[in-house]
């Protein structure tokens, strides 16, 4: 069923730019999916990692090719290869524009795609991208102590974003950065900060840098 649903989404959502459509209307322009104007990293990155997971699960390397091609297009339109910054969105309707907001979600999924594609193809570009993506997150999302300070709400989809970053950061450490202890130390520092800020019930939420409140009802996505 995973293959069935992925194929349906990919066939319906791939645009003439080689990017995945974010919406069939609104800021993405006309309804015609194949010539829609917009795309977001929050759609492309997850599609890439999903394709890699399907390739691993099924043995069908065509899914790696899907991930590779989509990654190349996201890299072209939604990424700065000089500093590892993953852009939020791109649009050409009614004129070319970018949203340069960086999020733990988008850095995380593009990092995951880079790691998995490197593991399969061995192309040094993915290795170099992965390091820059990881370094951008450390250098731009953290406070002076090196702990992540962004995406720490309790009322939106931001609640779970850091979990996506840490999922693929862990994979980066294990698969690529095992010879550089600074990345593991960074991960451990953030884990300890979050854990030490749990409340008396053992609940910790996505605001790792402050004590989890005793009376607030936290979303399952963010706790």
Go through each PLM region and give its residues.
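CBM-like carbohydrate-recognition segments
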Residues: 18, 39, 132-223
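Well-ordered alpha-helical scaffold segments within catalytic/enzyme domains
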Residues: 1, 46-60, 109-122, 164-179
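Extended ligand-binding groove/face enriched in aromatic
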Residues: 1-54, 64-65
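Active-site cradle of extracellular carbohydrate-active enzymes
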Residues: 50-55, 63-114
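Extended, well-ordered alpha-helical scaffold segments
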Residues: 1-12, 59-77, 122-140, 178-197
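Acidic/His metal-coordination segments adjacent to aromatic residues that form catalytic metal sites
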Residues: 28-33, 88-98, 142-152
């Amino acid at each position: 069923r995973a293959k069935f649903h992925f194929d349906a989404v990919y066939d319906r959502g791939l645009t003439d730019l080689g990017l995945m459509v974010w919406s069939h209307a609104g800021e993405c322009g006309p309804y015609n999916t194949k010539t829609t104007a917009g795309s977001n990293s929050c759609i492309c990155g997850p599609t890439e990692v999903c394709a890699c997971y399907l390739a691993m699960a099924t043995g069908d390397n065509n899914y790696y090719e899907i991930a590779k091609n989509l990654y190349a297009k996201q890299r072209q339109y939604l990424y700065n290869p000089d500093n590892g910054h993953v852009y939020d969105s791109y649009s050409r309707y009614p004129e070319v524009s970018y949203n340069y907001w960086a999020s733990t979600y988008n850095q995380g999924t593009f990092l995951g795609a880079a790691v998995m594609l490197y593991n399969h193809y061995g192309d040094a570009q993915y290795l170099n991208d992965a390091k820059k993506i990881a370094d951008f997150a450390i250098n731009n999302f953290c406070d002076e102590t090196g702990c992540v300070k962004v995406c720490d709400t309790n009322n939106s989809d931001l609640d779970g974003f850091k979990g996506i970053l840490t999922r693929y950061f862990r994979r980066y450490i294990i698969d690529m950065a095992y010879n550089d202890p600074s990345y593991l130390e960074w991960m451990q520092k953030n884990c300890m900060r979050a854990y030490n800020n749990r409340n008396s019930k053992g609940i910790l939420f996505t605001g790792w840098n402050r004590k989890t409140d005793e009376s607030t009802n936290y979303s399952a996505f963010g706790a």
